[in-house]
Amino acid sequence: MIKRKKIALIGAGNIGGMIAYLIRLKNLGDVVLLDVNDGIAKGKALDMAESSPVGKYNGEILGTNNYADIEGADAIVVTAGITRKPGMSREDLINTNVNIIKEVADNIGKYAPNAFVVVVTNPLDVMVFAMHKYSKLSSNMVVGMAGILDSARFSYFIAKELNVSVDNVNSLVLGGHGDLMLPLVKYSSVAGISIADLIKIDLITQDKVDAIIERTRKGGEEIVSLLKIGSAYYAPAESALLMIDSYLNDRRLILPCSVYLKGEYGVSNLFVGVPVIIGRNGVEKIIELELTEQEKNIFDNSVKLIKNLVSNV
């Protein structure tokens, strides 16, 4: 009998709960849903378990507040932490969330040192840096989810502007998860046609593209301002799940993720969003793209901000 994969979700809020549901929907493995609020984790787990006879979901789901229950997990997604409220930046969350990540990292190092860890907690590039530092896990096994989400937003806005299927759109966003992210227009396309060529044939204007880039950078803030009492969770959950799926099933997808750089893009000892191949060994390859001078300046400014934010972590 093939042993089922064990996936631990640290944080049973909106994102953690949604990931748990998607794991069961796609039958990726058994789930441990952990939260300091024991009732939330157990309540959501029981609710999902009771849906099994209707949805015909196989696999176990456990709600808990005991880190010992994540022992031997194959993959872990960390969403624990406070979320943004209207008017807050991701950076406003640093002090509180770093302390939360320290505790989570210590327990992952203790109970699941061989797991592939995806960090979702904001500010993302700082939290994944802290996770790597305090968990002592290998850098290829600790990644941050941001670029997939940012790229998805960029793709969606392009598709809506052109009134075409989102299936036709491929895009790529690099850099930090914030206002200095770098949507790469030259590496983005619609049905294989570059955005630059679409501008040339007047299917979209440069002004529209620029507006979409800015909306992408403010994508999370837009949702926070609408929700009032929370932040995005459907798209972040789908994005994190794609990373876990690529790892557990060795799909070797090329995905933009926040990863530890060792000289790539002229950056060392920081986690920054770049395209990578994720397979059964975690981050298997970092893909270095050629950037224009303008793109490099934006990327470097994003890196400077990340470097400043992690200086006291």
From Swiss-Prot:
<feature type="binding site">
    <location>
        <begin position="11"/>
        <end position="16"/>
    </location>
    <ligand>
        <name>NAD(+)</name>
    </ligand>
</feature>
<dbReference type="Pfam" id="PF02866">
    <property type="entry name" value="Ldh_1_C"/>
</dbReference>
<comment type="function">
    <text>Catalyzes the reversible oxidation of malate to oxaloacetate.</text>
</comment>
<dbReference type="InterPro" id="IPR001236">
    <property type="entry name" value="Lactate/malate_DH_N"/>
</dbReference>
<dbReference type="InterPro" id="IPR011275">
    <property type="entry name" value="Malate_DH_type3"/>
</dbReference>
<feature type="binding site">
    <location>
        <position position="153"/>
    </location>
    <ligand>
        <name>substrate</name>
    </ligand>
</feature>
<feature type="active site" description="Proton acceptor">
    <location>
        <position position="177"/>
    </location>
</feature>
<dbReference type="InterPro" id="IPR001557">
    <property type="entry name" value="L-lactate/malate_DH"/>
</dbReference>
<dbReference type="GO" id="GO:0006099">
    <property type="term" value="P:tricarboxylic acid cycle"/>
</dbReference>
<feature type="binding site">
    <location>
        <position position="90"/>
    </location>
    <ligand>
        <name>substrate</name>
    </ligand>
</feature>
<keyword id="KW-0816">Tricarboxylic acid cycle</keyword>
<feature type="binding site">
    <location>
        <position position="122"/>
    </location>
    <ligand>
        <name>substrate</name>
    </ligand>
</feature>
<dbReference type="GO" id="GO:0030060">
    <property type="term" value="F:L-malate dehydrogenase (NAD+) activity"/>
</dbReference>
<keyword id="KW-0520">NAD</keyword>
<feature type="binding site">
    <location>
        <begin position="120"/>
        <end position="122"/>
    </location>
    <ligand>
        <name>NAD(+)</name>
    </ligand>
</feature>
<dbReference type="Pfam" id="PF00056">
    <property type="entry name" value="Ldh_1_N"/>
</dbReference>
<comment type="similarity">
    <text>Belongs to the LDH/MDH superfamily. MDH type 3 family.</text>
</comment>
<dbReference type="InterPro" id="IPR015955">
    <property type="entry name" value="Lactate_DH/Glyco_Ohase_4_C"/>
</dbReference>
<feature type="binding site">
    <location>
        <position position="97"/>
    </location>
    <ligand>
        <name>NAD(+)</name>
    </ligand>
</feature>
<dbReference type="GO" id="GO:0006089">
    <property type="term" value="P:lactate metabolic process"/>
</dbReference>
<feature type="binding site">
    <location>
        <position position="35"/>
    </location>
    <ligand>
        <name>NAD(+)</name>
    </ligand>
</feature>
<dbReference type="InterPro" id="IPR022383">
    <property type="entry name" value="Lactate/malate_DH_C"/>
</dbReference>
<dbReference type="GO" id="GO:0004459">
    <property type="term" value="F:L-lactate dehydrogenase activity"/>
</dbReference>
<keyword id="KW-0560">Oxidoreductase</keyword>
<dbReference type="InterPro" id="IPR036291">
    <property type="entry name" value="NAD(P)-bd_dom_sf"/>
</dbReference>
<feature type="binding site">
    <location>
        <position position="84"/>
    </location>
    <ligand>
        <name>substrate</name>
    </ligand>
</feature>
<protein>
    <recommendedName>
        <fullName>Malate dehydrogenase</fullName>
        <ecNumber>1.1.1.37</ecNumber>
    </recommendedName>
</protein>
